[in-house]
Regions:
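PP2C/PPM-type serine/threonine phosphatase catalytic core
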Residues: 1-255
Length: 255
C-alpha cells in the first residue's frame, strides 16, 4: 500500500540521518548505541518501525480466545539474513566468549569488538563498519475492534518472557484490575521480568561454578583441594538487562 511505502521511505531516511550524526561524533558513540521501536497510528492504520531487538505485540480477543499478533521481528545477530549481511561486510557472528554463555554477538575479524547482540542499531559506529545497519524494518496492521492493547518492550522483557506469555499475563491482569489501576499492570510486568532475570543469574552462576570446579579437579588429579569454598569463588558478573515496557490500551473488549 502507498502509505506503507511512504512510511518506509520517511523512516529509513530519518534513521539514516540520525546515524550520520552519530558517525560525526564517533569518539562518543564508537561502541555505544541504542535500539529503537516506534509506533505510528493514523486513524486505524498502525505502523511499527523497528531497529534492534525491542519488540511490539498486539493482544487481540476474538470471542474469548486470546490471540497474539507479533508486530516486529527481532534483529538478533544470528538471524540468517542479518548474519549474511554482517559476514559480507567483514564481520562474523559467534556466541559470547566469556564462559561460552550468552547470546550470539557481532564481532570484527580484525578486532575483539564490538560484541553487539543486535544486528541493527543507532550509534555503535564501530559495529556499523562490519555490517550492523541503521535501516529499520516496518510492519503494518489495520487495527480491529477486538485489538485490546499493544505492548512495546526492550529485550529485557522478551529475553525472559515469550510474546504469548506477556500477552497472556496482561490479559490476566486486566480481568483482575479496575481501569484506573492499569498503570500497575506494566509495573508488575516489569517486576516479573526482573524476578526471572534474578533466577537466570543464579542458574548461570551455578553452571559456571560447576564448570570451573570440574576443570580444577582435572588439574589436581581428581581432587578439588579448596572444597569449593565461598572465599575461593570468582566474581561472576550478574546481569539484568534493561527492562522497559509500555502498554497502550485500546477499547478493551473481553467478551
Amino acid at each position: 500500500m502507498q502509505e506503507r511505502k511512504e512510511a518506509e521511505k520517511f523512516f529509513s531516511k530519518l534513521f539514516t540521518s540520525i546515524q550520520k550524526k552519530f558517525k560525526k561524533k564517533s569518539n562518543d558513540f564508537d561502541r555505544s548505541g541504542t535500539c529503537s521501536i516506534c509506533i505510528l497510528i493514523v486513524n486505524n492504520h498502525s505502523f511499527i518501525i523497528n531497529l534492534g531487538d525491542s519488540r511490539a505485540v498486539i493482544g487481540h480477543n476474538q470471542q474469548g480466545q486470546k490471540i497474539v499478533y507479533q508486530m516486529s521481528i527481532d534483529h538478533k545477530a544470528n538471524r540468517p539474513d542479518e548474519k549474511e549481511r554482517i559476514e559480507k561486510n567483514g564481520g562474523y557472528v559467534a556466541v559470547e566468549r566469556e564462559h561460552g554463555l550468552g547470546p550470539f554477538r557481532v564481532y570484527s575479524k580484525s578486532d575483539d569488538g564490538p560484541g553487539l547482540a543486535v544486528s541493527r542499531s543507532l550509534g555503535d559506529v564501530f559495529g556499523h563498519t562490519v555490517g550492523v545497519s541503521a535501516i529499520p524494518e516496518i510492519s503494518y496492521k489495520l487495527l480491529e475492534e477486538n485489538d485490546c492493547f499493544i505492548i512495546i518492550g526492550s529485550d529485557g522483557v522478551w529475553d525472559v518472557m515469550s510474546s504469548p506469555e506477556v500477552v497472556g499475563y496482561v490479559f490476566e491482569k486486566i480481568e483482575k484490575e479496575i481501569t484506573w489501576q492499569r498503570q500497575r499492570i506494566v509495573e508488575e510486568l516489569v517486576q516479573e521480568c526482573r524476578n526471572r532475570w534474578e533466577l537466570i543469574n543464579i542458574y548461570k552462576e551455578k553452571i559456571i561454578l560447576e564448570k570451573m570446579s570440574s576443570k580444577e579437579k582435572e588439574k589436581e588429579g581428581g581432587q578439588n583441594k579448596d572444597g569449593g569454598g565461598v572465599a575461593n569463588r570468582p566474581q561472576i558478573r550478574q546481569n539484568i538487562d534493561d527492562i522497559t515496557a509500555v502498554i497502550c490500551f485500546f477499547g478493551v473488549n473481553l467478551e
